[in-house]
Structure formats: C-alpha cells, structure tokens
Regions:
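Class I SAM-dependent methyltransferase Rossmann-like catalytic core
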Residues: 2-39
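Conserved class I S-adenosyl-L-methionine
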Residues: 41-51
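Conserved SAM-binding loop of SAM-dependent methyltransferases across substrates and taxa
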Residues: 52-64
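Conserved SAM/SAH-binding beta-strand->alpha-helix loop
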Residues: 74, 94
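Conserved SAM-binding loop
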Residues: 81-82
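A short glycine-rich, Lys/Arg-flanked "PGG" loop and its adjoining helix->strand segment in the class I
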Residues: 130-142
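Conserved beta-strand signature within the Rossmann-like core of class I S-adenosyl-L-methionine
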Residues: 142-150
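Core SAM-dependent methyltransferase catalytic element
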Residues: 171-188
Length: 188
C-alpha cells in the first residue's frame, strides 16, 4: 500500500518522468525477471527506472547470488527503494549515464548480464531516448539481453532499438493495465 501511495503521489507530481498510470504488479515483475534468463555467477543485472521497486524486488529474489543495480532519477523513489530493497545497489541518476556508473562501480562490460527497463522510453524526448539506448548498447556485450516492458506494443513495432535483435514478445494480462514484455538481444 505504501508503494502505491508513493507512486500515485509521484505520478501526479511528475507524470512525464513516471510514465505509468499504476505501479507494475508482481506478476509482470516475475515475468520480467524470468525473461532475463540464466546469469553467470559474477554477472550483474542493471535495472533502469525502478520506480517503487516491483522489478527490483523480483530481480533480487530471482537472482539471489547476483548483484542488482537500479538506476532511478526520482529522489523520492530512490529514498524508498534504498529502504525497501537493501540488497540492491540503488543509484540516483540518469539511465543515459549507465556506462559511467558501471565504471565508477568497477564493473566490466562482460559482467553486465542483462539490462531490464521500466522506463517510458517512447514518451521521452527523442534525444534522451537515443542517449539511453546508446548507454544500453555501450553497457551490454553481444548476446546479452535487454528486457523492456510497455503498455503499447504497437508503438514499439514501429521502433526497433539500434544494435538489438527483437525476440517474441509476451502479453501480461495479469497486470493493471495489461503490459507487454519485449525481450531484445544485443547484436554483435
């Protein structure tokens, strides 16, 4: 309940940044984590735009032996995430600076096992959207997964992230609103 109240307060105050009408549900979060696939023991998972932490919690649970790093722009969400998910590393900042954050944490590109995103990328200004995709491409080596969710699969059909190959999407009806999980693989 506390997560929902926090989310709705931030959604009302910062609609463009939040980009959703409700926090992601646990079923969607579980599917997002499973879609990542297996990770090597030293791999980290980077989450972009964790919001209230539904995906963060699912990632920590699904990958108990791997480090989860979440990058969140909203300071209110950051404060709540740090308290709610102490096993995750929470970075307050912009997803477009992900390569810099990985360098600061001493994480090699080869050890980034996946990027998971809850960002409303297609609602962002085009320059920022491009910068975020560039950051994802710079961070992931070939063959590694990038998992995005959206409420509008149609909008994503017209947009394919440069440097990534799409895989079949999955509709998640047990979420409000229903969502689509979009898996991509970093191309060589």
């Amino acid at each position: 309940m506390r997560d929902a109240l926090c989310f709705f307060g931030q959604m009302a105050a910062k609609w463009r940044e939040t980009g959703a009408i409700a926090p992601s549900g646990p079923h969607l979060a579980k599917i997002m984590a499973r879609t990542v696939g297996p990770l090597a023991p030293n791999d980290v998972v980077v989450e972009l735009g964790p919001g209230t932490g539904a995906f963060t919690k699912a990632l920590v649970k699904h990958f108990p032996n791997n480090r989860v790093i979440a990058i969140e722009f909203n300071p209110v969400f950051v404060r709540n995430l740090r308290a709610a998910v102490p096993k995750a590393t929470i970075i307050e900042g912009c997803a477009s600076k992900m390569p810099q954050y990985m360098d600061e944490l001493g994480i090699e590109r080869e050890n980034v096992g996946a990027v998971v995103s809850g960002l409303p990328l297609l609602m962002m200004p085009k320059d920022l959207c491009r910068d975020v995709f560039d950051a994802i491409a710079q961070t992931l080596v070939a063959g590694k997964p990038y998992v995005q969710f959206t409420y509008s699969e149609r909008a994503w059909r017209r947009f394919e992230p440069p440097g990534f190959r799409p895989s079949p999407s999955r509709k998640v009806w047990l979420n409000f609103p229903p969502a689509v999980v979009l898996p991509f693989t970093r191309a060589s």
